[in-house]
Amino acid sequence: MKINIKGREVELKNTFRSMIIYEKVAGKTFNPQGITEILLYFYSVIMASDKDCELEFDDLLDMVDANPKLITDFSEWLNKSFRISNYLNGDVEKENENPKKA
């Protein structure tokens, strides 16, 4: 997912750096239970994806207020990112592993 921040295009990356930044900011591990956690993680992903980014959390809130679809797009991107990661780690059950009942 790409996002334009202050005239700069940033390619978002879901990395360990994002999780570490989130833990430092939130004081807990990432476990999205509400909009605050998702927005904090969105901010953390941006910071991890562009180390030179000069975005304050309040700026992100302004961006989302002006374009609420950003949070929907981010949530969809994040879900896809976690699914891919789980698949690559072998955490997803294969369809053929469960025998069909006769």
At which residue positions do the language-model features occur?
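General structural signal for alpha-helix termini and helix-helix connectors
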Residues: 25-28, 48
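Short, hydrophobic/amphipathic alpha-helical patches that form generic packing surfaces
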Residues: 37-48
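Short, structural beta-strand-to-alpha-helix junction motif
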Residues: 14-26
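Charged interaction scaffolds used for protein-protein
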Residues: 4-6, 19, 28-33, 52-102
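Well-ordered beta-strand scaffold positions
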Residues: 8-10
